[in-house]
Amino acid sequence: MKKLARAIVKMRRLILIAAVLLLIPAAVGAIATPINYDILSYLPQELDSRVGQLLLETDFHLASTNMITVEGMPTNELLAMKAEIDEVPDVLNTFWLSDVLDPAVPTEMLPADVQQFMFGKNDSTILIVQLGGSSVSEETMQAVAQIKKILRKNCFFGGISVILSDTKELVMGEMPWYVLCAVGGCLLVLFLSLESWLTPFLFMLGLLFPLVYNFGTNIFLGQVCFITVSLAAVLQLGVTMDFSIFLLHRYDEEKKLCASNEEAMENAICKTMSSITASSLTTIAGFLALCAMQLTLGADLGIVMAKGVALGVICTIVILPSLILFFDQWVEKYRHRTFMPKLTHLSHFVSKHPMPVVVVFVLLMIPFGLAQSKTDIYYNIFAALPQDMPGIVGTNKLGEDFGMMTNHFILVREELTASQVSTLCDEIKEVDGITQVVSLDSITGPGFETELLPDELMNIVQNGGCKLILANGRYKSGSDALNAQVDELVRLVKEADPEGLVTGEGAMVKDLVEIADEDFKNVNIWSIAAVLVIIALSFRSLSVPVLLVASIEAAIAINMGIPYFIDDSLPFIASIVIGTIQLGATVDYSILMTTRYREERLALRSPKAAAQQALEHCSQSILTSGLTFFAATFGVAAISKVELLESICMLISRGALISMVVILLVLPAGLMLLDGLICRTTYHWLNAPNAAKE
């Protein structure tokens, strides 16, 4: 390790040049990495809803089908607009009644199902826009943007592709502000806690390298979710800032003992490497636990963040020393006193009253622990988006004018007779909440020769060996009523055709609900188990990992219980990921406190004195880390219009503060009270035989 440290210091200029040059391919990779805005695409591919969605995309080209509600528009103007939309690249077809019948034919002559489907309230009709790509492809995004420009007044464009296009536009516009808020918040905390006005900027420069490298290497993942992209920089900034602080503090200590800055840095690298490597393992393990999710969004976020932490460690050890040595004289020139308190009075209070502190905390935990399970969770992804987005407005308009809050796409084998399909459609119409049912047979009627229908229509309703039935419902996706509706549809379809499939937003969100409940349990189990094992190996203890993880889990329970008391609801993904993020990111505080407590006990101090000293000396580091993590995420929560991101960041920022308070108040008291148990269940906890017992 000493040889490696010496090589890093000796070749610091070469390392800095190489690091800067590596930013170029990393930046190219970051720009070239596709971003996925469709959370439902992360569902397991073997689910019926996903299999059906793939068939809609490959055989029917309906996966990215969107609908335009047109109110009060003359037929000739509507046909002219339809023709313009047909000319847009990637638009396969814009379907309206004129594709089947002469527009002069009175609507009263149409079958009742067709009338109900094509004409709604407010003198409205509907255009079905069929796009060639998937709902998240770049071609689809461009086509949606062009169609928006063509639409006249009183036209409302709705559908998943439109909403995803709006989401992309919103997130890409806000993302630079996320980073600026995170950087600004971190700088403010660092100005207060560090001893030089230049050091915060130096840290930000040092963190630029792992951030860009992390985003650049995402290209090897194929694509990343917009949630990951939005959170990764902010989380990486908040989580890995500690490593830079540890290195600088150790370097300042070594400078007082060594003959040269180079020697001081070599010693600092050696001592920092072991401490931050062990510390980062718990954080990496916490993020990798997200890979246990069936919803592969977890693996997406977990891998990117674990990779970011690992790169943060490497860059702290290899690149940051070069920057510190290069700017050392300016750092010294602009020194100032730190404004972060040591919490001396608090340390004496906690060490004098450990039992009351723990009792009060346990009593406080009871209501929050009960409230945690009662916090309202919602699964309607679009409810987490601004409701004034054009795609949301257009989709809601379908519900207002046509009763289409949710579309169900039902696929059955083409071998089913017209009579069987008709019977199935009649049964579907009786399902609670279903407003319209349209199939080939409801359009043509019995005995009609399908060869007379245009290819454009036939390709929509029958293709790839399957017939398509479209059922519209008035319930919103993710609701209990909608989930019950999907169950009933699946039952009816399977009775008519054991190979039949029900897909669409409603079916996929129902699968999401079921998977999310399982993912929540799996992620918590894996993250807790991984962190327990790492801490147990680090301390060679059975009791210490339980105490440390219990402290953070208690903080998580309080964090998750607060929404119940403030009458707030959480998006499902926030409830899944917050536990592992808060555990992985803040368990380091407890490790730092426990390590210092052990050092004080080894120095022959009593448990009371050791707890007091540990709290006093660790308070500044924990305050700096906790407030930095809070500042990095709170800014995003304050400005984001995407409720999904706002909720996650608010939980993380609040969790950082709660974990910080628990570690500063409760953990030292717990270490004091359980000192005897820790000594008996930890291998060589106290090597010094004369360590005080009282």
Show which residues each predicted segment covers:
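Structured non-transmembrane domains adjacent to transmembrane bundles in polytopic membrane proteins
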Residues: 45-161, 376-544, 550-569
